[in-house]
Every structure is written in structure tokens, then in C-alpha cells.
Amino acid sequence: MRRTYPLRLTINGRSINQVIIDSHYEAKHSKTINDNLILELIKGLNGRTYEAESISAERWEIYVNDPLFLGEKPYRLVWCLHPDEDSVGVINAFRRSNGKVSK
């Protein structure tokens, strides 16, 4: 299930008007993260430019921020943009336990 939230941002020079959060994260991570925290993480992307990790055949640009900090807590955020859409999609998000972050 996906949930949509209105939110105005600029990411990679693109105007974003909404965030679509996939419920995938809830299967394993609902005790440490929720939609409100994810929206705060997404707000932290505002005004910045990122390089895509990959681009799908359907032209979805996949991004991974790891670590992405909210306060002093590290999170992993997997998100996507499409050149024809005005939304950012959140594929997955979770908090890194014990401060473990990938290098």
C-alpha cells in the first residue's frame, strides 16, 4: 500500500509537490520509523543534488542515502524520482541500529 503526502521541495533542481511512501518498510522496521520520520528525512533532501545509484528501464532514478542523519540517529533511505513526475517515491527506509552505517 502506498500513501501520498503533499510536500513542496526542490531535489536535483526539480520541483516536487508530493511524497509517495511505500509501506514496504513496515514489515521489518515499524518499531523504529514511521511516515512522519520519513517525511522529515525527505525534507532534508530539499535544495540538494544527488547522483542516482541506478536507472530502471522505465526511467525511474533510484537513490540511496546511507547514512542520512535525523538528529544524531543514522538512517538508510531508498527513494526514487521519475523525469515525468512531480513526486518523490520512498521505496524503503530504516534506522541503522547501534550506529552501524555502510561505507
Residue ranges and their predicted role:
Residues 1-103:
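Ribonuclease/tRNase effector modules and their secretory precursors
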